Design a protein with these regions (language model features):
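Residues that act as N-cap/strand-start positions at coil-to-secondary-structure junctions
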Residues: 29, 39, 48, 77-80, ...
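Short linear S-[DN]-x-LW-Φ motif typified by the pepsin-like aspartic protease active-site region
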Residues: 28-88, 117, 123, 237-245
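Extracellular beta-strand solenoids
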Residues: 54, 116-118, 135, 153, ...
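Surface loops and adjacent helix of pleckstrin homology
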Residues: 48, 57, 67, 97-99, ...
Length: 245
C-alpha cells in the first residue's frame, strides 16, 4: 500500500524562514505523488474547503497535486500539509482532517486546491463543505456533493449524482446513464450529446424549465439514452444539445 502525506512546506528549502518562503515554481511542483495505473481507478476526494479538479485523459498513471489556495496564508498551507493521499488496490483517496471546531459554512476557512489526473473512465466520488468540484474529460460514474459551491462534470461516460445546497450544477455532455441533479438554490444545466435520447423528470419550486432538445431520429436503446432527474427549489433548469452549449 502506497501512502503519503502531501506537505506543501516540502516544496521549499528548509533554511528559508516560513514568512519568506516563495510561491512554489513549476519545477518544484513536479514532486507530486505519481502512481502507475494502467486501468481506470476509483477516486474519492473529501475536503472541507477548496477546489477539487479531477481530469481524465488517455494515460497510464495517476498524478495528485495538493496546494494551499493561498500560499501566503498559514492556515491554507497547514491544511495542505495535513491532507493525506492514499492509493491501494486501484482506489485513490484524498482527505483533509475533519476539524469542525474551525470550520464554518460562511467562508473564511483554510482552503486548498486538489488536482488529480487519472485514466479515462475512472470513477469519481467527491465531497466539499465550501468550494467547487470539477470533473474534466471522460470520467466514469460520479457521485458529488457540495454544501455551498458549484459542481461541473464535462463529459461523463456513466451516471452522475450531484447535489449542492447552494450552487449551480452543469453537465457538459452526457451520452448515457442516469443524471440525478439537485440544488436548493441555483441553476441546473444539462447538455445531451446529439444522437442520444433523453427522458426528463424535472421539479422546480420557483424558476423555469427550458427544454431545448430537438427530435432524435430512430428508436434509441438504453446505451444511447440519458435519464435526467433534476430538482431545484429556487433556480432554472436548462436541458439542451451539447453542441448548443
Amino acid at each position: 500500500m502506497n501512502s503519503t502525506a502531501i506537505r506543501a512546506a516540502d516544496r521549499f528549502t528548509g533554511r528559508i524562514p516560513r514568512s519568506r518562503r516563495p510561491i512554489p515554481s513549476r519545477a518544484q511542483e513536479n514532486t507530486m505523488p505519481t502512481f502507475q495505473t494502467p486501468e481506470p481507478i476509483a477516486v474519492a476526494v473529501e475536503v472541507l474547503s477548496g477546489t477539487v479538479t479531477v481530469i481524465a485523459s488517455d494515460r497510464t498513471d495517476t498524478v495528485v497535486a495538493v496546494r494551499p489556495a493561498d500560499a501566503a496564508k498559514k492556515a491554507d498551507v497547514r491544511a495542505a500539509e495535513q491532507t493525506r493521499v492514499d492509493f491501494a488496490d486501484g482506489a485513490l483517496t484524498v482527505t483533509t482532517p475533519k476539524d469542525w471546531r474551525t470550520y464554518t459554512p460562511f467562508g473564511g476557512n483554510p482552503s486548498i486546491e486538489v488536482t488529480v489526473e487519472v485514466p479515462t473512465g475512472s470513477g469519481f466520488r467527491g465531497t466539499a463543505g465550501v468550494g467547487r468540484i470539477l470533473g474534466a474529460g471522460e470520467l466514469g460514474d460520479c457521485v458529488l456533493e457540495v454544501s455551498a459551491g458549484d459542481i461541473v462534470v464535462e463529459r461523463p461516460l456513466g451516471s452522475v449524482t450531484a447535489k449542492t445546497a447552494q450552487g449551480n450544477i452543469r453537465i457538459g455532455e452526457a451520452t448515457r446513464g442516469v443524471l440525478r441533479l439537485e440544488t436548493s438554490v441555483g441553476d441546473l444545466e444539462v447538455g445531451i450529446r446529439p444522437g442520444s435520447a433523453a427522458r426528463l423528470e424535472t421539479t422546480v419550486a420557483s424558476g423555469a424549465v427550458h427544454n431545448q432538445l430537438g427530435p432524435v431520429d430512430g428508436a434509441q436503446d438504453y446505451e444511447h439514452t440519458v435519464r435526467v432527474y433534476a430538482r431545484s427549489a429556487l433556480g432554472n433548469v436548462v436541458i439542451q444539445h451539447a453542441s448548443a452549449a
